[in-house]
Amino acid sequence: MSNQFSEAQHQLDALGLRCPEPVMMVRKSVRKMAQGETLLIIADDPATTRDIPSFCEFMDHKLLASQTETTPYQYLIQKGL
């Protein structure tokens, strides 16, 4: 795991879950976070490669890093406003 991913303040394990569950869990987790905090999402649903970046853009969160070459996929997001 890269150093950037290991520095996340929160972590969400969405392994084995299929659309729309991972994004629903991300949304619930982010609501509990303070602005600027980071969340590492670990998932294996191929739909997350599209859904997580779209969620971040739509909700004004920042996708800091992603690893989608191999499973499990990893996404590091930072909560926006």
Curated annotation (Swiss-Prot):
Keywords noted in UniProt: Cytoplasm
Offer a single GO CC term for the protein: cytoplasm
The record's annotation in CDD domains points to: SirA (cd03423)
The subcellular location is: Cytoplasm
GO biological process assignments? tRNA wobble position uridine thiolation
Coiled-coil region(s): none
Q: Is Nucleus among the key words of this record?
A: no
Q: Indicate where this protein is primarily found.
A: cytoplasm
* Family under the similarity heading: Belongs to the sulfur carrier protein TusA family.
Q: Known HAMAP family for this protein?
A: Thiourid_synth_A
The name under which this protein is listed is Sulfur carrier protein TusA
Q: What is the organism of origin for this protein?
A: Shewanella woodyi (strain ATCC 51908 / MS32)
Question: Taxonomic lineage of this organism?
Answer: Bacteria, Pseudomonadati, Pseudomonadota, Gammaproteobacteria, Alteromonadales
Give the gene name: tusA
